[in-house]
Amino acid sequence: MPTSQYWADSYLQKMVSADDAIAKVRSGQRVFIGSGCGEPQHLVQALTERANRFSGLEIVRLLGRETASLTAIADRTEDTSLNIRSIYLGSAKSPSIARHKRFITPMNMSDVPSLFLTRKMPLNVALIQVSPPDDFGWMSLGISVDVTMAAARSADLVIAQVNPMMPRVMGQSFLHVNYVDFFVEHEEDLLFVPPKQTLSEAPSQIASHITHLIEDGSTLQIGLDAASQATVKGLSDKNDLGIHSQFLTDDIMHLYARGNITNQKKGYNLSLIHISEPTRPNAPSRMPYSA
């Protein structure tokens, strides 16, 4: 475990601007970007602004919101600047794949940390987003842990955007200052997935069939697709449900607040909503939302 002595001095010495941090990235390197709503937007924007200075840069990401349109840059630069490798198939754009602009590494999310940690897919750089450090130098990956912890532990160079808007989330989400090479302080709103205000007829019909199959006491894994979200909305008459999933949505939290989700009959991690996936091989990541 890293020592917390003098961590503040180390933190200040490692603080740089986004431009200076991205200048540490070299052509031909493999760069991991924090996943989903945990994407370090300020760092990604700085990366895109320097894209024409790179050659053969490979961007690795699990699930991206792509606010800086990295795919558009990959398309525009005809493969000379950067390529994007996705581990989550749902984030892929088929035209980009057809033109060899984007690549897919299909695998279970739970296997990805081992891929990084064993260096089967070595990462040269990890761009992540964290909360400010606590009194002992520990920072939280907050709302998006998934495979980011393994990426941060295995990358040759770790650059962290420190955002006061990132909440400290309990569980295996903490990274010490000593594990990070450079810090970029920048406050900005976190990304979010807007809820679908209206659902089409097909997802609603699918959900109506699924909800009849879900019994009281069932443990659920919830996706982000329309049918899954419609199913969650139809579970208000179910009791003692459990959650063991990659994502935590507003509708899931509404069920928890109403008492439909108790996690008492899961058989594993009782009383806990289990969110995300292993951050290292054979070690579950837990976020205890219930007492």
Language-model-derived ranges and their functions:
Residues 1-276:
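Conserved alpha/beta enzyme-core scaffold
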